[in-house]
Amino acid sequence: MVLHSHQLTYAGIAFALCLHHLISAIEVPLDSNIQSELPQPPTITKQSVKDYIVDPRDNIFIECEAKGNPVPTFSWTRNGKFFNVAKDPKVSMRRRSGTLVIDFHGGGRPDDYEGEYQCFARNDYGTALSSKIHLQVSRSPLWPKEKVDVIEVDEGAPLSLQCNPPPGLPPPVIFWMSSSMEPIHQDKRVSQGQNGDLYFSNVMLQDAQTDYSCNARFHFTHTIQQKNPYTLKVKTKKPHNETSLRNHTDMYSARGVTETTPSFMYPYGTSSSQMVLRGVDLLLECIASGVPAPDIMWYKKGGELPAGKTKLENFNKALRISNVSEEDSGEYFCLASNKMGSIRHTISVRVKAAPYWLDEPQNLILAPGEDGRLVCRANGNPKPSIQWLVNGEPIEGSPPNPSREVAGDTIVFRDTQIGSSAVYQCNASNEHGYLLANAFVSVLDVPPRILAPRNQLIKVIQYNRTRLDCPFFGSPIPTLRWFKNGQGNMLDGGNYKAHENGSLEMSMARKEDQGIYTCVATNILGKVEAQVRLEVKDPTRIVRGPEDQVVKRGSMPRLHCRVKHDPTLKLTVTWLKDDAPLYIGNRMKKEDDGLTIYGVAEKDQGDYTCVASTELDKDSAKAYLTVLAIPANRLRDLPKERPDRPRDLELSDLAERSVKLTWIPGDDNNSPITDYIVQFEEDRFQPGTWHNHSRYPGNVNSALLSLSPYVNYQFRVIAVNDVGSSLPSMPSERYQTSGARPEINPTGVQGAGTQKNNMEITWTPLNATQAYGPNLRYIVRWRRRDPRGSWYNETVKAPRHVVWNTPIYVPYEIKVQAENDFGRAPEPETYIGYSGEDYPKAAPTDVRIRVLNSTAIALTWTRVHLDTIQGQLKEYRAYFWRDSSLLKNLWVSKKRQYVSFPGDRNRGIVSRLFPYSNYKLEMVVTNGRGDGPRSEVKEFPTPEGVPSSPRYLRIRQPNLESINLEWDHPEHPNGVLTGYNLRYQASCLSSPVNGSKTGRTLVENFSPNQTRFTVQRTDPISRYRFFLRARTQVGDGEVIVEESPALLNEATPTPASTWLPPPTTELTPAATIATTTTTATPTTETPPTEIPTTAIPTTTTTTTTTAASTVASTTTTAERAAAATTKQELATNGSSIWDIRAWANSNWANITWSHNYSAGTDFVVKYITSNKTEKSIPVKAQTPSSVQLANLTPGMVYKLWVFPIWSSPSEHSYITFTTSSAYTKNHVDIATQGWFIGLMCAIALLVLILLIVCFIKRSRGGKYPVRDNKDEHLNPEDKNVEDGSFDYRSLESDEDNKPLPNSQTSLDGTIKQQESDDSLVDYGEGGEGQFNEDGSFIGQYTVKKDKEETEGNESSEATSPVNAIYSLA
């Protein structure tokens, strides 16, 4: 065997044997086999402490453990007398142990067992004793009752409050608190002494604000006892003034307290003495009084305080010296001082000592005829006396032994013989304590033994120091010699050094030191030898290690690590990065002589360490790798695309089960290739279908592919980067592998019946890479699940086989084995299947129904017997249907429903029933075939419930003062309706920032027959939210919620012209089209045109370009036009976006656009407000492309971009639009304003003057060229001009399009004036005047002028008197 770490253990044993040999003693090695064979006197291994205090509430355990051969027996003495354990039923002794157990569970007083116990362990070779164990029961006596009077004390006087705690075992811990259980604050003026008393150096007036109670905490019982509290009454010369005390620099003089020099309260006088035992802690204490409170300092006469052992405690009033020794004796003094003076107290410290060991006697093992000695030296103060015992008895009273001589603290043995074994006790004692030690003397004669394993193999690296170990044992102690290769010369000297512990050391192992070494151990009883084979190995060295490198990101650095090592040792090469194990991922490749990193990144920078190790040694080499990052500005503007396809696939290294595939990578298109996917296609099972074969890092261009037998392979490669996957490469040439027998069998084998007399066996067939050969087929075997049954088999090619004429639902054992022309697959697994099921023969009985609530019932039934199921029980089913409603004339659906209760159970719950209805129910049991017979039909009613919501709630606003509500009854009343409950509340828009304000909730209750209600508005701008519920006597039903329509004066968004410019024409990026329509009559808001949109949950802002005209009307409504651009910048592939349009209202906008990108392209809509608030909204692919932007800011100007999600917007390709202003209550009727009435009167007067001038000119015979346009009129119903230069949209009502009063329509559509041609009645009415005779020119002129203006502005306005006046002007 090979010995490495064990060498140290054996060397330690051999060294111990050698040491004891020098003092004529033998140490028995820690070998269980040897120790079990050698006789050994008893030795105490575990015992309780000398002063043993126990808890009276627990059982008592007094420990005593010992070892020896034979196993010792135990006995006890109590108070010096034999303690008979067998006579006391409460006392027992543990098996193979001397530990006493005193059990009080059955009663008894622990105090009765107090005393001094000692344990005796005996065997054939002697008796060992434990120390005397003083057993005491813990006590926590009560505090003596006493009356504590009020203590009167002058302010500034000293005071001590005595505690006098009851004596406990062990002594209690003392602390002071008030009666309200608050700790007493302690400082250098007020502190607790070592005796538990509370000392006041001087009393202050605030000391009387609390009382003082001494508390004692007892450790074992975990109890706290409290003394009656002290109450102080402080007599003072001046009344208490807190303000003056805070402002005064000396509170004592401020209070009129006389300042005094210090005096000692404890200890008294100027000197005292204290005795302490060696090894314990010494605590010296000085407490002084005085005004102000004095400071305490400590000194030692004639020297410094012991360094490293002293500690000041209790505000310097106590000095603790740890682990006192004789050197700490002397005089210590404490100095108490304040500004009035100082005083000193001297404490004389005397250190005594209980006995302590100088030389504790040790076990002595001797050979027959050898000499030895036991030494027992102890010290103490006073000096202890030494007493020897043998086997527990005084040595003076033991039988005489001529080979033994007692000389004070030493026993000398000469010429010992077999049979002289015994256990000796040494007792060292003085007035402060005692020590007891056991040491046995054992006389052994043992032939030599080699303790090391036989035929060891030691491997060592050349030129290293090594040592061959040969631990041995014997009595007398044997002598040991070393030989090499059976030569007679003893090895000692030169390169070899033999140690007495049996080790042979070589200062430098060389190749010629290899060989077989023999160690021979000899004593008078015999001789024994063992062989050790030494092999010298070559060292492990890194001949070429990694070097520091500086590389660019994305490159492929290689770190070298070439190792030379002994070929007979296994080499392991590991890599560390920054002194931590390196994880070798798919970007790294570890080889025998180095490490390659593909696509190195900044995170790869650091220290790399190559560690080459064998079982004997190791070597390492380190290098630092620096990675230079490519500047970001070099790649930022480069467009990233999917990589180009790999090309030029080539097959090489053709082998039976592998092939090497090589390819040339395509362009990565500015995104590094991260992976290559190799796919294959075969032409036998699934021709034309490609399967993934393997995946490789993006920095390789070849791969060794593992192949399956009998597959005609064809390969292709796909490159992958962060953008996506490339197109597949062109396929490689085909490669056919040879065949073999299948190695696996089909999986997923199942057996189940499709009819009651068959079983269909199915499985997952082998694929092309698993067939391994031609003519793949399957051997199907089956038999009844009976070890004695016969197997049936069938060979098939399809992945199924049907077995007929089977009993109903019996288990079968099934095996399916694959086979081809090269042979069969290994023996298949056995699966369990079942033949077909038949319908169950019995129905559940004793079906009972308990109604839980209006929609649920609880069912119980008696289960069917398992023999009647004829298959696997799947579930119990409860079929139920609604037979009728308890409401008259209410039609109900009688559709049958069922609830399943899986498994073998007899109870369940049916829920989701309609309340207030009659139901019928029947039950069946179901297996895999279907339902069994039905049980008896049960009928039950459901109680009344709450109704569903009303079918609808319609809201109409006939005017600004009221809202009409109309609703319908609930579809499911679920009981007798008792009425309706309507809750509603108003909300008005306060500001774009603060949102809406909600008013209080109003409640209305209606009878069950009422379905209409009118709400009177409190103001015309509020919107209302309505909550309507129907009600039965059970309670309110489901709610229907509706909100009143939008405000009446909000603009109605209407799309602008749908005209698209030619594709070759591009507008400026901010080009917009705006149309304005002016109406002369009030209009009612209409819903916006429905456009397919994507809901946007976030708050956004948009605007649109508008134009408006002011006319003489009661209400003016501005219609928003669509902002549009014909085309954005072209993408790299020629695709583009055009015709971006925005239909905007005050707080939302519909956005549409056209594009020729591929289907499935997602877009981003980005918009920025005039105050630079930016939002981006992703839009999923849809047709047509549109999105709705909600929660915009009224009156805000927006810039908007649309671009593909994988792209970024062009800086100039945007449109702008503006949202309309919000409605305010400051709108007034313009027709009632004084300035407007005055303006209209002035215009009428001006028209009259102009008409008079015209008539005067006519009367003078002027002629005008108006005959050609005599019958032409610009009617609001006229169509657009044919060139499509503008689009006219009228918002006028039908009344506006009718002929004016006193007019008629001609056959050609013109309007003929019936009255006088120069009549101005129509103008007085605000209508359109017409002059149709030759002298009538105003209408013709006005129409022509309006037409010209309309064509120039690409907008249309209704003809009005204002236009006519402007035309004439």
Swiss-Prot record:
One of its GO terms (molecular function) is cell-cell adhesion mediator activity. The chain crosses the membrane at residues 1236-1256. It is a single-pass type I membrane protein. SUPFAM superfamilies: Fibronectin type III, Immunoglobulin. Residues 645-740, 745-838, 843-945, 949-1057, 1133-1222 form the Fibronectin type-III domain. Keywords: Cell adhesion, Cell membrane, Disulfide bond, Glycoprotein, Immunoglobulin domain, Membrane, Repeat, Signal, Transmembrane, Transmembrane helix. Residues 1266-1282, 1289-1298 have a biased composition (Basic and acidic residues). Glycans are attached at residues 241, 247, 323, 427, 464, 501, 692, 767, 793, 853, 994, 1009, 1133, 1150, 1156, 1171. SMART domains: FN3 (SM00060), IG (SM00409), IGc2 (SM00408). Disulfide bonds join C64-C119, C163-C214, C286-C334, C376-C426, C470-C519, C561-C610. Residues 1257-1369 are cytoplasmic. GO terms for cellular component: axon; plasma membrane. It comes from the Eukaryota. The record marks R636, D637 as: Cleavage. The keyword Mitochondrion does not apply. This is Neurofascin. It comes from Gallus gallus (Chicken). The lineage of its organism: Eukaryota, Metazoa, Chordata, Craniata, Vertebrata.
